[in-house]
């Protein structure tokens, strides 16, 4: 039977003072808390760098799943790669997702909001020295004209080393969101084995994205995407969750720390399937208003 979070559960999780969470031993994830977002993302950028360095020493390939946001950690990673001459020739990057228009077609590749590939070309690959950069054929994007490619390649390579993941307010990772339909149901097992696919973006995610960037102009956010599925991401040896967005994410971090796997918050699947799940967050995001006295005025 699928697990459902009760009001009692979520109210209790949100009531804990954030300081008390640091010493708890019953969390589903390993917790790394910093004073602010900058420190948090600097730690993540250094963690990325150290993984590549270690695998290069052992002459091993490195296999990642990367998001097109957040991007703060890439500043640290890119600076170290360029300054320390760290080769990325053995790095394979599976990109999480790409926006599609309302007819399910990709947008032109460019440094625009609608083009996640263009965003990564500009903010990531375009800032790395050519002689150190990831080879083009090792930059794997989900494509509507070859939808099984990423899944088949991931299996051929033996799975992922680390998923570096932002997390949505309702627990999305990539655009793997809670399935919502009155007419069909997906089991937790099916979701955990989900492949690369084309999806409609949930309405509340469109609201969140539009608030963040477009003054809550919903129509400015693309309504569809192509996303890698959990089959690729849950093949990882490690998942690093990067959540330092403040008020929008104060509840989802509590859910990630305490909940059993539930389709309502897909991020909760990671602790069940991935051996090492680390939540990097800051004090503001880890705090919660329900852990303080709340009045109506």
Language model regions located:
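ATP/nucleoside-binding phosphotransfer catalytic cores, i.e., glycine-rich phosphate-binding loops
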Residues: 2-6, 11, 28, 34-35, ...
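Gly/Ser/Thr-rich loops at beta-strand to alpha-helix junctions
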Residues: 64-73, 168-172, 246-249
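Class I SAM-dependent methyltransferase SAM-binding "motif I" and its flanking Rossmann-like core
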Residues: 174-226
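Hydrophobic, aromatic-enriched interface-forming segments
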Residues: 159-172, 176
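N-terminal glycine-/serine-/threonine-rich phosphate-binding loop
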Residues: 1-64, 82
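A short secondary-structure junction signal
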Residues: 151-152, 173-187, 251-256, 291-292
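A glycine- and small-aliphatic-rich helix-loop capping segment at beta-alpha/alpha-beta transitions
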Residues: 77-88, 110-111, 178-188, 259
